Amino acid sequence: MDADKDNIKQACDERSAEMDDMRGEQSMGLVHEIMSENKELDEEIKKLEAELQSDAREFQIKENVPEKKLKLTSVESPKDGCHFSNSSCSFQVSSQILYELQEGQALITFEKEEVAQNVISMGNHVVQMEGTPVKVSAHPVPLNTGVRFQVHVDISKMKINVTGIPDELSEEQTRDKLELSFCKSRNGGGEVESVDYDRKSRSAVITFVETGVVDKILKKKTYPLYMNQKCHSVAVSPCIERCLEKYQVFSAVSKKTVLLTGLEGIPVDEETGEDLLNIHFQRKNNGGGEVEVVKCSLDQSFAAYFKEEARETI
């Protein structure tokens, strides 16, 4: 009888030990699983932080902006709020003007316009080239026509472009699915005002009711679109409108640059010729002044490009 009791007690002790071992193994397994999940979450957090930094860099503009003094005279209160629905900018674009410098010619640019005009008015000049007097003639630089225009850019704060839309449903059903997907706040969406869907290009322009929704959506380049019990990834981008205005064609004569002719066959190379012309036209007693740059063309022709700092003739 006592032996039976001892056997039962021993069996209970062994069972208890087995249970303790099982609990320990389960605990270790649970700890390992939690650690593995934490590691995956840490990697996901790092990935999301990298994406946020990348998106932030895309919206940054690195440019040294000169200081400006501003005087605020009044505060406008637009009634319809349209002034705050777009980010706008405008700038003027002017084409560079090409001039082909032929052999035996040189271009010389002075710091001051009046010096260049004086050199031209004198007509002929005698320049010493390694002991050889060379007669050169000064002329205005005849430039070809150029163009200028203004570019206006409006970036909407209320609209986005959506591309890569699956062509699985009718146009009306697709518009409904777009509206339903982009109104989900958990994905960064908001109340949709309208959906302009183009089936041919598989794209759409979506207009939202509230400001701020577009900024949240554009933090990522894609957005989930739910259609036919599937989740598709569509591309989202800013809605940008561009407009060209005040297109003008003009011809001009450079104000600070002078064309010199008569340099064919001079007994020096181009670099030496440029130095000698620079020295000659630096001197005031030769009708010159401070020189910015000289370019000679003795052996081959060159292409020179002028920016719009010239006087318009038409």
From Swiss-Prot:
Domain NID, chain residue ranges per copy: 104-193, 202-293
What keywords does the record list, in alphabetical order? Coiled coil, Cytoplasm, Immunity, Innate immunity, Isopeptide bond, Nucleus, Phosphoprotein, Secreted, Ubl conjugation
Keyword Transferase assigned to the entry: answer is no
> Cellular component terms, GO, for this chain's entry?
cytoplasm; cytosol; extracellular space; membrane; nucleoplasm; nucleus
**What highest taxon heads this organism's lineage?**
Eukaryota
Spell out the coiled coil positions from the record: 31-65
| Triggers of expression | Induced by Sendai virus.
Name the phenotypic consequences of knocking out this gene: Knockout mice show decreased inflammatory response when exposed to infection of injury, which can lead to lower inflammation-induced mortality. Display normal development of the immune system.
Chief location of this protein? cytoplasm
Compartment(s) = Cytoplasm; Nucleus; Secreted
Q: Give residues where Phosphoserine occurs.
A: 16
GO MF terms held by the record: identical protein binding
Q: Where is this region: Disordered?
A: 1-24
As for PTM, the annotation reads:
May be ubiquitinated.
Q: InterPro entries under this entry? A: Nmi/IFP35_dom, Nmi/IFP35_N, Nucleotide-bd_a/b_plait_sf
Q: Which GO terms describe its biological process?
A: innate immune response; macrophage activation involved in immune response; negative regulation of cell population proliferation; negative regulation of innate immune response; negative regulation of interferon-alpha production; negative regulation of interferon-beta production; negative regulation of non-canonical NF-kappaB signal transduction; negative regulation of type I interferon production
Entry-linked PANTHER family: INTERFERON-INDUCED PROTEIN 35/NMI N-MYC/STAT INTERACTING PROTEIN, N-MYC-INTERACTOR
The Swiss-Prot or TrEMBL record describes its family as follows: Belongs to the NMI family.
What does the function comment of this entry state? Answer: Acts as a signaling pathway regulator involved in innate immune system response. In response to interleukin 2/IL2 and interferon IFN-gamma/IFNG, interacts with signal transducer and activator of transcription/STAT which activate the transcription of downstream genes involved in a multitude of signals for development and homeostasis. Enhances the recruitment of CBP/p300 coactivators to STAT1 and STAT5, resulting in increased STAT1- and STAT5-dependent transcription.
Question: What is the protein named?
Answer: N-myc-interactor
Organism listed in the record: Mus musculus (Mouse)
